[in-house]
Amino acid sequence: MESQQLSNYPHISHGSACASVTSKEVHTNQDPLDVSASKIQEYDKASTKANSQQTTTPASSAVPENPHHASPQPASVPPPQNGPYPQQCMMTQNQANPSGWSFYGHPSMIPYTPYQMSPMYFPPGPQSQFPQYPSSVGTPLSTPSPESGNTFTDSSSADSDMTSTKKYVRPPPMLTSPNDFPNWVKTYIKFLQNSNLGGIIPTVNGKPVRQITDDELTFLYNTFQIFAPSQFLPTWVKDILSVDYTDIMKILSKSIEKMQSDTQEANDIVTLANLQYNGSTPADAFETKVTNIIDRLNNNGIHINNKVACQLIMRGLSGEYKFLRYTRHRHLNMTVAELFLDIHAIYEEQQGSRNSKPNYRRNPSDEKNDSRSYTNTTKPKVIARNPQKTNNSKSKTARAHNVSTSNNSPSTDNDSISKSTTEPIQLNNKHDLHLGQKLTESTVNHTNHSDDELPGHLLLDSGASRTLIRSAHHIHSASSNPDINVVDAQKRNIPINAIGDLQFHFQDNTKTSIKVLHTPNIAYDLLSLNELAAVDITACFTKNVLERSDGTVLAPIVKYGDFYWVSKKYLLPSNISVPTINNVHTSESTRKYPYPFIHRMLAHANAQTIRYSLKNNTITYFNESDVDWSSAIDYQCPDCLIGKSTKHRHIKGSRLKYQNSYEPFQYLHTDIFGPVHNLPNSAPSYFISFTDETTKFRWVYPLHDRREDSILDVFTTILAFIKNQFQASVLVIQMDRGSEYTNRTLHKFLEKNGITPCYTTTADSRAHGVAERLNRTLLDDCRTQLQCSGLPNHLWFSAIEFSTIVRNSLASPKSKKSARQHAGLAGLDISTLLPFGQPVIVNDHNPNSKIHPRGIPGYALHPSRNSYGYIIYLPSLKKTVDTTNYVILQGKESRLDQFNYDALTFDEDLNRLTASYHSFIASNEIQESNDLNIESDHDFQSDIELHPEQPRNVLSKAVSPTDSTPPSTHTEDSKRVSKTNIRAPREVDPNISESNILPSKKRSSTPQISNIESTGSGGMHKLNVPLLAPMSQSNTHESSHASKSKDFRHSDSYSENETNHTNVPISSTGGTNNKTVPQISDQETEKRIIHRSPSIDASPPENNSSHNIVPIKTPTTVSEQNTEESIIADLPLPDLPPESPTEFPDPFKELPPINSHQTNSSLGGIGDSNAYTTINSKKRSLEDNETEIKVSRDTWNTKNMRSLEPPRSKKRIHLIAAVKAVKSIKPIRTTLRYDEAITYNKDIKEKEKYIEAYHKEVNQLLKMNTWDTDKYYDRKEIDPKRVINSMFIFNRKRDGTHKARFVARGDIQHPDTYDSGMQSNTVHHYALMTSLSLALDNNYYITQLDISSAYLYADIKEELYIRPPPHLGMNDKLIRLKKSLYGLKQSGANWYETIKSYLIKQCGMEEVRGWSCVFKNSQVTICLFVDDMILFSKDLNANKKIITTLKKQYDTKIINLGESDNEIQYDILGLEIKYQRGKYMKLGMENSLTEKIPKLNVPLNPKGRKLSAPGQPGLYIDQDELEIDEDEYKEKVHEMQKLIGLASYVGYKFRFDLLYYINTLAQHILFPSRQVLDMTYELIQFMWDTRDKQLIWHKNKPTEPDNKLVAISDASYGNQPYYKSQIGNIYLLNGKVIGGKSTKASLTCTSTTEAEIHAISESVPLLNNLSHLVQELNKKPITKGLLTDSKSTISIIISNNEEKFRNRFFGTKAMRLRDEVSGNHLHVCYIETKKNIADVMTKPLPIKTFKLLTNKWIH
């Protein structure tokens, strides 16, 4: 709505120019070229004479004949006031005012401005001649007053009094912004035209039709200044006025030029966007038209690229050309010329054979030329309000016809317009009814009329959001003072008087109603097309009718002026109002179901949908009349308001029309929703939905990821389901352009099945509206269901499933049927449905004990798809079950009472509704059923291994399952359940996202050992393992065992009187989830453990200690204890936050725990199986059912969860066993050959550097006398076995230097040419790390040396020949080798013997026994790696002395002398080391990784979100046989070798935190599935993200007298294939991590304790060797320690009893470990699981735990 408000001039009356609730100003849509002087009638210079006799004063200047002039009125009659929206007023050229022209009948009192004070301002005087209309024009229009009942002025009387009636012109609006100036100029030009000044307006060429007079210039100047304030003028206008402030004509001329240019460009863009071609015109003409438009736009600076142009052209193709949309849309680089070649080909084919049909595509029905315009299309305003004006030869003044003339015209019945109407009803004037339509409502007392309004009609407005009328005559059920805010285009409020209904009665007897607002402050009665669309009525502007979506014509549309109108004759007066639904009387004698109850029962669907469903019997068991609908209209569901909050309505009508021609289940829409974050790993993160185009039947499937194979499985499932269940074949599937749909795998699958994929265009989500809206609707329902029920978020897909079942059964208001009915299925029986989250009690037919409660509290989710049962969530068991054995818990409406639904309770309604079903349940309760143990059809949510919050008030004390009193003996008060709601846990535990959550895996375990083991990684409880106990007392447990057995029989119950509930850390799967359970007292724990542990070893001794250190020998002094405690003191263990006590809910105390033997797994199946069972029962618990075990294991195969190893018994089939003729894998080559580096190298600079390196190498070879230069041998004379091929290799080093090396092909060397017993030794990495650690602690100088061409210093004993280098040009000759050339098998061993001999004899060094290439004397330690030497010494001069000796024999380079006291940087054997003596040492590989990783061609994400961990728990590798061709297999194996090779190099150097992932993935190098590659990429991505991490060492405390060498051990029991265990060890010297190892156990362990023993036994040999090395290099005493988090293992080590070892393998391993610990004086100590940093070696950990365990030693 546009309001003309002259706020800058308060003395001038305000007026309203037009009325609309759209933001479009009605006068701004005229073609800009229509305002030029060439289309305006020439100005008639004849003017009427001035009325010189009339005297005018400011008090009597109004013209009495015009009712809108403010005539003098009595004091008692106030002037009409309309606030900011006054009645319609006009502007007049009044000559009777000598002081100026009159505006709105008031005397001119325009204040003088600086412009008016200029000499160019000519105030009009009495003789001034203002423009007047010629007398032949006729009577000008005038608007009636509110008091007048006549609409038009009598023509005859007006003619007789021409001198007293003036022409009143609508003033232009005020300019309020520089951006609005172009639109404002249009209205200003129209104002000049209506003022008979059209002749002075500049034409297109900038010249007016006639010259402007001085008076006209004054008039033009004044009006421009008033309505265009200078502060709102654009800059270019101000620039013109700054030169000549009166040059208004130049401003108008430039404005018209801009309008013309913008119009041409806009027309071209509109034409291009609305192209249509079906072959009816020659293809050449169509091509010429399109190319001309594109060229014109490009020339004007609007670039249209080929992609956009092709999309626009293809969108307009129809008929035989339409298929080009689908055959060409995949060509990303398609050009317009290529597209027109296809169009020409089809056109020529049509001309040659019109009757033949193309055979290269499916021939769907041709798209109908439906020009129907929907109200919510992308251009509603252009279609509905402002269509393109038709050319009209009549002048503007033709509107002023006489009323009597129009009334004498013949008339016809306009209502006879039928569907075939194609010509618009064009009214040039409201009196010119050339179709004879009668104005039946001209006498209605409207408040306002505009001069271009068609009386008796409603203006159709596509942009208006609400319908507004000025008369209350047609408003039904009106209510006053509505709280509604309506604003116009300028965001100004429009006061609303009332709201009601506007009722229509159309010509086909259709009755409907819409909401209407009443306000007198508008110029038109507006009918909103948006509100008509809501009642299934659309406006077709090609037929000019209102019609329903099925094409039924309801009423004609009349075009008058620029707008379209519909007659008010179809409105029903308010005196025949029909009673509304609110007036329906409800009988008190009949109890009806309350609507809020039904609303919640049916998944919170809206009232209209529910009523349609009941009316059409898609919901059975009760009728529409059984529901109380009195509150349906005004009812607001709080859960719906929260869960279904949305932005705006979805745009309708976006699908292609031809889709309607498909049969049921032939055209599917699909889309993927997700991910949902912060959920357990067992819960799905995505779901994929499918919708049938014809029936609107919906399917949803859960997904854990969006990988290709996951999507392919779902597609295979649904296609098979449709084929078998509905005997239909899917032809087309519409989907978006996500990578999960556009991948090659799915494309081949669809192509193989003959299915056409239909993709949406880029960024065009509207074209995918069916699937997008379904996902949004289901998500709204999901949020609402979870909000209402209070269930945890990990059950979100159950809410989706419930909503899908219900919505498939609800009728569509449009089709009057449900999706199930369309699909030919029976309706949904609501008596079998429960509200989502309805509290129930599930029967446990097989409890642990006969005295245990038989009922388990649960929450109903949705009907089962695989049985007649119901899927119910059991929080206490953390699982869902499919069962019919449940009872509805009365009085529990979940969260329904939280919002105060008028204190409604639905117990009685629910009982009546499910009465028949209760009888069915009761009749089956006596049967022994196993359906409680049948998993849901969604196994991803079964057996959720987590500890979420216990349900708040899961059972009130009145219904406590521990109460032994029968229900019949309770009092009446006790029978009624407490009003406190039973509600599911609101959320999962906060740490659940970091936990190892998986379906439980049932494995057979040995009962004798299942409970003594405290943990696989620390244990479930803190056990009373005796600490610091003498070995001599280890047998005393036998005497106490019998006495304690009896006590334990009574300790199974968890009553508060017997148990102290305190916080005890629970080892989650993998020992990573910090939760608490009620702790049992020390004495009670000991009783239970000893009683339940007829174990492999003796039970612990009785006496306890507060220490956590268990020595192998009996400690007799305090000093020994302090020594053992000091072992842990300086280790880089994580600091754990203090645990705050947590009070557990009453239900946990009241309900006895239902125990499980479940185990969890994580990445690689790596988790703990040590679920601690507290009740010894021979009966299997609810979770131990065999059926459940089978389903749970099958779940691993169907979940598509990414992981490393599935712990299942199915034998793994690697591809290497199935693929034949895989001879070898090409080695990884990082160097260049001679031809690559020199011959064909196009990089001139690099080529020159390689040539230089080549000559340098040749010179070095000659200098070292590498071969015999005295004689050349003929090839035929030498034994071929002794001829070694040679070659030059080139590479570029990290420091930028280019190097060449002449090498022998040792890979094809004959075995007879070398001694296989010789060894080529290099320094062990542990020796280097040990030396570096000791150097830091002892302030050593570190010197780095390099011996050039080291191998060439070693003589060769064998007779070998090689071909000469290429530069010699002797290809047929051979030369004999004299030195150990690089590449020969024996060269390394020869060099080692040579340098070893020199160091011992000439340098006074000796080699450390057991550690090759480590040499020492009293002052210096040397680590040798081929030609690199690292020297360590406390005296730098000692190092220099060694260097001097080496230079006497070898070409020795000093890389880094290490003499600075500041930080020194080294590059030692790939490690980038930062060393400051006496302070710290940092080891990393940032520069190396920055250079190498990008060369691996791994899809890195350098700017995206960085990974926080190298993997995540709960992921499994699918071991199904891989189908792949041989070439692709070799390529992928080669890629895996490169990736894992680099990762191994980095991991074993210093990134010990990655060793578990590297070790697991390395086992799959020969199984390069897509999943394995993805996980390898993820590992490389993590290495890239953390390439700046360093291994941090700090100098040991100087007060420490001894060196401390510690091995920390851990094991994950049975988490590898074939139930092998993963073991890991970390080695620390003086608190610095120097090494780590992660590997799979060589034998199958049968318990957690056995796995821990195996891990410790693997660490002992290396620990002893390192101990010897440390003692050799540093003469300090050494303390050795073994740390483990398994107290049962410690108990075995300190025990002397071996009678209960169950087998000899375990026994021998344990006995050997006892001997090693005892003989090597090892201190075995206990470490808490949460602090066990070796945990990272055995399993994937959550992000939080991974960081906690590693942030102290690597960061």
Curated annotation (Swiss-Prot):
Region feature (Disordered): 1-93, 126-173, 352-421, 956-1087, 1092-1111, 1130-1187
Domain Reverse transcriptase Ty1/copia-type: 1338-1476
EC number(s) on file: 3.4.23.-, 2.7.7.49, 2.7.7.7, 3.1.26.4
Keyword Ubl conjugation: no
Region annotation Integrase-type zinc finger-like: where it falls in the sequence: 583-640
Family matches, as SUPFAM superfamilies: DNA/RNA polymerases (SSF56672), Ribonuclease H-like (SSF53098)
Active site (record annotation): D461 (for protease activity)
UniProt feature, compositional bias: Basic and acidic residues: 1038-1053
GO biological process, one term: DNA recombination
Site (Cleavage): H401, N402, N582, N583, A1217, A1218
Gene3D superfamilies on file: Ribonuclease H-like superfamily/Ribonuclease H
Parts forming coiled coils: none
GO cellular component entries: cytoplasm; nucleus
Region (RNA-binding): 299-401
Catalysed reaction equations from the record: DNA(n) + a 2'-deoxyribonucleoside 5'-triphosphate = DNA(n+1) + diphosphate; Endonucleolytic cleavage to 5'-phosphomonoester
RNase H Ty1/copia-type domain segment(s): 1610-1752
Record field: compositional bias (Polar residues): 1-10, 48-60, 127-152, 1005-1015, 1054-1082, 1101-1111
Binding-site residues for Mg(2+) 1, renumbered to this chain: D671, D736
Domains: entry comment: The C-terminal RNA-binding region of CA is sufficient for all its nucleocapsid-like chaperone activities. Integrase core domain contains the D-x(n)-D-x(35)-E motif, named for the phylogenetically conserved glutamic acid and aspartic acid residues and the invariant 35 amino acid spacing between the second and third acidic residues. Each acidic residue of the D,D(35)E motif is independently essential for the 3'-processing and strand transfer activities of purified integrase protein.
Known function: Capsid protein (CA) is the structural component of the virus-like particle (VLP), forming the shell that encapsulates the retrotransposons dimeric RNA genome. The particles are assembled from trimer-clustered units and there are holes in the capsid shells that allow for the diffusion of macromolecules. CA also has nucleocapsid-like chaperone activity, promoting primer tRNA(i)-Met annealing to the multipartite primer-binding site (PBS), dimerization of Ty1 RNA and initiation of reverse transcription.
Misc. remarks from the entry: Retrotransposons are mobile genetic entities that are able to replicate via an RNA intermediate and a reverse transcription step. In contrast to retroviruses, retrotransposons are non-infectious, lack an envelope and remain intracellular. Ty1 retrotransposons belong to the copia elements (pseudoviridae).
The protein's name in its UniProt record: Transposon Ty1-DR5 Gag-Pol polyprotein
Organism: Saccharomyces cerevisiae (strain ATCC 204508 / S288c)
